[in-house]
Amino acid sequence: MTQKVNVVGAGLAGSEAAYQLAQRGIKVNLIEMRPVKQTPAHHTDKFAELVCSNSLRGNALTNAVGVLKEEMRHLDSLIITSADKARVPAGGALAVDRHDFAGYITDTLRNHPNITVLNEEVNHIPEGYTIIATGPLTTEHLAQEIVDITGKDQLYFYDAAAPIIEKDSINMDKVYLKSRYDKGEAAYLNCPMTEEEFNRFYDAVLEAEVAPVNEFEKEKYFEGCMPFEVMAERGRKTLLFGPMKPVGLEDPKTGKRPYAVVQLRQDDAAGTLYNIVGFQTHLKWGAQKEVIRLIPGLENVDIVRYGVMHRNTFINSPDVLNEKYELKGHDNLYFAGQMTGVEGYVESAASGLVAGINLAHKILDKGEVIFPRETMIGSMAYYISHAKNEKNFQPMNANFGLLPSLEKRIKDKKERYETQAKRALEYLDNYKQTL
């Protein structure tokens, strides 16, 4: 095999992609700029350095990321194998000794006969087969190259996302379907508030705890995308003239205009997930849950992705990537990791796994690998390439709302998740036999 692949970035996604390629006999140049050039967030020269938490989140199959991890175990994931080896006590979560974890991955890749490690900065996308996995702190020159090849409106430099919730957890008796002024089809679920309910909500927002901002995120990335708690600080009426404006949203049950309205917009093609419109936020997750559950209809809501505002570099994947994490119209260029719109350590590694396997199959002329949507790894790939709201695409983590509904509705959440997990692993194992 003379064909050599360039994998740019040795984070979780790049490390996984390089390993999957190398295990299939493909020669790989794994290019990592550290330690020649450090990022503001990294501190070592190790691959797959965990820059925030040392937890890879839940390990149980009643947890979406737990299902994703189990799927990756079935697919010989370097990242999950390393995490299992470096595991430290953390209850039901998979937490690791971050030094052992990164050390095991680094040693495995540096000693792999099919991998050549190059420590240098990449300012231009290499020629030939390439996977870009440079993460949220992609350097300016490479980011400009990505803009040039994907289009000027297809690369974002910050992540300003409103919370995303499960439709099944909304109290539909308290909300109504309507678009403002009845324009177009009724596309929003509306949560009406009385003045008393709004005041209670407003006071809670002002008292809610805000998350600290990392030093390297303090530049002003959020023009035109203000956190709703900052709007609230500007005065009680600011939200009423902003995201909670009730004009044109009269309640069809009463014919009257509510004092305030929180709008929910469909977020996925299947209609199982909704985002809270205009509620991008810096609040801590616990505070978000408390505040959101004060909204009528959302008292018992399940939040699958909390609102965030932080520096990120990610592409508008539904417009430019397919389910193989391949750039549309470019059969030699793939992307992986957070820059594809997946959110989280495990999700990033999973995208690298899919990109690596697919590029290996392309080189070996073995056909494309599209994992079933019933699997968590397949549903993530489907989401980033088919998100309903592609004009305001925001990163997503693994959650059961991405999976197709079960044929038979199961009301008990734990039982439903267990059934979806069992189905996911059955579909994965059946699909593996075709690879």
UniProtKB/Swiss-Prot annotation:
Keywords: Cytoplasm, FAD, Flavoprotein, Methyltransferase, NAD, NADP, Transferase, tRNA processing
NAD is among the record's keywords: yes
Entry's localization field: Cytoplasm
UniProt-listed Enzyme Commission number(s): 2.1.1.74
Catalytic activity: uridine(54) in tRNA + (6R)-5,10-methylene-5,6,7,8-tetrahydrofolate + NADH + H(+) = 5-methyluridine(54) in tRNA + (6S)-5,6,7,8-tetrahydrofolate + NAD(+); uridine(54) in tRNA + (6R)-5,10-methylene-5,6,7,8-tetrahydrofolate + NADPH + H(+) = 5-methyluridine(54) in tRNA + (6S)-5,6,7,8-tetrahydrofolate + NADP(+)
Cofactor: FAD
Gene Ontology cellular-component annotations: cytosol
One record GO biological process: tRNA methylation
Family: Belongs to the MnmG family. TrmFO subfamily.
Name recorded for this polypeptide: Methylenetetrahydrofolate--tRNA-(uracil-5-)-methyltransferase TrmFO
Species of provenance: Staphylococcus epidermidis (strain ATCC 35984 / DSM 28319 / BCRC 17069 / CCUG 31568 / BM 3577 / RP62A)
